[in-house]
Every structure is written in C-alpha cells, then in structure tokens.
A protein has these predicted regions:
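Aromatic- and Gly/Pro-enriched, solvent-exposed loop/edge beta-strand patches characteristic
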Residues: 80-82
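N-terminal leader regions
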Residues: 1-42
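A generic structural signal for ordered alpha-helices
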Residues: 1-4, 22, 71-78, 110, ...
Length: 171
C-alpha cells in the first residue's frame, strides 16, 4: 500500500519518548503543585502541539490514568493523522478493511508490538477507522465493523461487504 495511506510509525517512534516525557512530567507537576487554573496544562498542550503538529483539543492530559495509560496517549499524540487520499483504489480499501478485521499480527519490533492494535482496531481514534471516516465520509460508519442481525442471524459483515458499502457509488 502507498506510504501516504500507511500510518507513519517512524515519525511516531521519533517523537514518542519526548511526548511521553511531557505527559509524565505534567502529572508529576500536578501531583506536587496542582494546576487549578490550567496554566501548566496549556503550556504542555502547546509544547505537545509543537512536537506533534496536532490539535491537542481532542486529547485529555488530565486523566489518562482513567483511560488507557500514558503510553497509549503518547502514541496517539505521536502518530500523524491520516491524510485525504482522493485517488485511493478499491484494492487499497480492501487491504485496509481486511487488516481491520484480521487478528493483530505479531511483531519482533517492541514499538509495533505495543501499539499496532491502536491503528488497526475499528474504533474512534484508531488510525484506519479515522482514515476511512476522512476518505469515505459519505459511507463510513463504525457500525460497519459491529455484529448485527442479518437475515435472522447475528454476524459481522465480511470484508467484501464492508468494502462494497464504503466504495458506494464510486465504482
């Protein structure tokens, strides 16, 4: 698949440690001094936006410990956002959907082993789900990847069925 479609793990890997360090330092700061006025939060948010190039408003630095942990938050911030790819092919769409439905592969690379599921899983914020939402706005729905009753049977849609729905009137 083309590089402009794939998640940019190398960029994420380069800035991950710095982002994680900022998140943990902010937590330590709050534990010691508090941040009732949010001044330190805004400073950290600005630094993270500068490092990642992302709009930080969709991330919560306050309560990551109640969510998925600092490491996952740091990865989500570090991984570049998906891009609009107007000339995506149906074959490329099929590869994406098949990856999203397949079990997570095993990696020898610890970074990929830890975080690949975060790009593949069919949920809000996951890289490929967000890629589909961006590039197939008229036909994408998270529900495409959920079990449903079809002709009286509870099942998931197949990869081909999902691709046909997403591809819609394009083809």
């Amino acid at each position: 698949m083309r590089a402009q479609i794939e998640p940019d793990f190398e960029r994420a890997r380069k800035i991950y440690d710095e982002i994680l360090e900022q998140i943990l330092a902010y937590t330590d700061y709050c534990d010691e001094f508090g941040d009732e006025d949010g001044e330190e939060y805004r400073k950290v948010e600005e630094r993270l936006a500068k490092i990642s190039g992302k709009d930080m408003s969709k991330f919560s630095l306050h309560e990551w410990w109640e969510a998925e942990g600092a490491e996952n938050l740091a990865f989500d911030i570090a991984l570049p956002e998906p891009k609009v790819v107007p000339d995506i092919t149906k074959d490329e769409l099929s590869v994406i959907v098949e990856r999203m439905l397949a079990p997570v592969p095993k990696f020898d690379d610890d970074f990929l082993e830890a975080f690949y599921i975060r790009v593949e899983f069919a949920c809000r914020g996951a890289y490929f789900a967000e890629f589909l939402k961006l590039n197939f706005a008229d036909t994408f729905s998270f529900e495409l990847f959920e079990r449903r009753e079809i002709e009286g049977v509870m099942r998931e849609l197949s990869a081909n069925e999902i691709v046909e729905i997403l591809w819609g009137k394009r083809g």
